[in-house]
A protein has these predicted regions:
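N-terminal small/glycine-rich loop or linker at the start of catalytic domains
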Residues: 2-28
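Hydrophobic faces of well-ordered beta-strands that scaffold small-molecule active sites
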Residues: 12-14, 51-53, 83-89, 110-114, ...
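Active-site beta-loop-alpha junctions enriched in small/polar residues
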Residues: 15-19, 56-58, 88-92, 115-119, ...
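Active-site mouth loops of central-metabolism enzymes
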Residues: 19-35, 88-96, 121-123
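Conserved, mostly hydrophobic/aromatic
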Residues: 36, 43, 54, 112, ...
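Active-site-adjacent beta->alpha loops and helix N-cap segments on the catalytic face
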Residues: 60-72, 95, 120-133, 151-155
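Alpha-helix-loop-beta-strand connector modules within alpha/beta enzyme cores
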Residues: 62-87, 136
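Single conserved hydrophobic/aromatic residue that forms the stacking wall/gate
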Residues: 169-178
Length: 178
């Protein structure tokens, strides 16, 4: 499936659910794909051009499940075809770098957020890390790099130099690590 890829990334991206919040925390947090699609439609109509997407299992837990992501991407593509979709590879302390990479390969999303330090806890990019970044770049995936401190910026620069990726990168420095 070919997903919408804007020439320029939208200036407003919504992140309606994250990895941890549940209905007890906020009754409107979308946990199912159906709920997430409905929120995405409403946000798009209000002016958001992109969504940062987490999928949940039947227990409402954040999962790196390629099947659920593909289902969500398919639904979002049909319901909000002009919205840029970014999936997360967030480990949440339960997924390994190998599982993060596997999700990215299996889904090949239009956009992905990658916590650089989560993906490369050794702080030394491996051949597998380089292959992943080259693959996603060649596939046209827009990567948002989550960086929490200056060391993470150095790690990303090292990774991109080793991978010989010179294209525009998208960096986010969250105000706090999760």
């Amino acid at each position: 499936m070919t997903f919408f890829q804007p020439d320029k990334l939208p200036s407003l991206m919504v992140a309606p659910n994250g990895a941890r919040k549940v209905k007890k925390d906020h009754p409107e947090v979308p946990l199912t794909i159906k709920e997430t699609v409905e929120v995405a439609k409403n946000c798009f109509e209000a002016g958001a051009g992109a969504i940062h997407l987490h999928v949940r299992n039947d227990k409402g837990e954040h999962v790196l499940d390629a099947g659920l992501y593909k289902e969500a991407l398919n639904e979002l593509e049909h319901q909000v075809p002009k919205m840029h979709i970014q999936v997360t590879t967030e480990a949440v302390g339960k997924y390994s770098p190998e599982e993060m990479r596997k999700l990215a390969y299996d889904v090949t999303p239009p956009g992905a957020s990658i916590g650089t330090a989560e993906l490369i806890p050794s702080r030394n990019p491996t051949e597998e890390d380089l292959k992943l970044y080259k693959y996603l770049t060649e596939a046209g995936t827009k990567i948002q790099h989550l960086l929490y401190n200056p060391d993470d910026i150095s790690l990303l620069v090292n990774l991109l130099n080793k991978a010989e990726i010179l294209s525009l990168i998208h960096i986010s420095e969250p105000t706090r690590p999760y």
